């Protein structure tokens, strides 16, 4: 197996890996693939190298060699439930940040190829069959943007078991308040309801479908990175105090 084979095999198994490339020095051009725990998966060990506690892209020098460390993970997979106009914009935004995207709707006419980028997987399916037909725990984020509250409710019951995976629900504050009240009446715990993101998105004053999509994807990124989505300028002022 070559380095590409090793990486693809790891990605296919949802196993992260780390590539260390020697940029200069005696082993210039060499690539070594490690597991997150430092086990060698491909190549010859770099003497003295140990896996850093925080794994992120970085340059480092060791044994008179300059090296570059690059973590490799399978692209996040997003499931979008509902195929309306906002859904199309949301799909495009998630593709833009490197996610895989699957869109599900029970209306076949809303899943035409011309409505979505060719990289989007389109599935015609009754929302009541989500749990039976899809591996829901393989998604890192689920976005519920159906056409009516009753379909939102069906979707939420279908994905309930994957919490605390990111699950966002689009709707007005009034619609979301009512929907979450009904969920509690149907047996959802406060902890489960509080793990849902609704109304979905960061408050950036979004109005158009494109802006709403930006708001939704921004919230997803903030949640995944354990951030609150505040202004960076505000953070600067806090640091100066």
What are these regions (language model features)?
Residues 1-106, 110, 114-119, 137-140, ...:
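Segments forming oxygen-rich coordination pockets for charged ligands
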Residues 21-23, 81, 105, 145-146, ...:
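Short beta-strand segments
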Residues 93, 154-158:
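A short acidic, amphipathic alpha-helical/loop segment
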Residues 104, 141, 146, 157-182:
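ADP-ribose/adenylate-binding Rossmann-like module
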Residues 128-138:
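Short amphipathic alpha-helix with an adjacent loop that forms part of the alpha/beta core around
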Residues 170-241:
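Adenosine-phosphate binding glycine-rich loop
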């Amino acid at each position: 197996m070559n380095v590409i084979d090793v990486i693809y095999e790891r990605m296919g198994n949802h196993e992260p890996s780390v590539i260390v490339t020697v940029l200069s020095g005696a082993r210039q051009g060499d690539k070594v693939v490690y597991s997150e725990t430092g086990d060698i998966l491909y190549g010859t060990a770099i003497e003295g190298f140990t896996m850093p506690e925080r794994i992120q892209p970085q340059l480092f020098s060791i044994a008179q060699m300059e090296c570059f460390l690059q973590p490799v993970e399978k692209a996040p997979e997003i499931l979008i439930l509902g195929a309306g106009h906002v859904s199309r914009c949301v799909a495009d935004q998630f593709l833009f940040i490197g996610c895989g995207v699957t869109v599900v709707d029970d209306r076949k006419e809303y899943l035409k190829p011309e409505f979505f980028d060719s990289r989007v997987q389109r599935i015609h399916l009754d929302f009541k069959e989500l749990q039976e037909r899809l591996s829901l725990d393989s998604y890192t984020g689920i976005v519920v943007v159906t056409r009516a509250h009753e379909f939102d409710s069906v979707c939420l019951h279908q994905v309930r078991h994957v919490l605390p995976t990111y699950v966002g629900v689009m709707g007005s504050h009034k619609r979301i308040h009512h929907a979450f009240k009904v969920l509690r009446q149907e047996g959802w715990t406060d902890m489960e309801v509080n793990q849902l993101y609704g109304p979905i998105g960061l408050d950036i004053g979004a109005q158009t479908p494109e802006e709403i999509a930006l708001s939704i994807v921004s919230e997803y990124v903030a949640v995944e990175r354990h951030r609150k989505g505040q202004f960076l300028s505000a953070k600067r002022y806090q640091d100066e105090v």
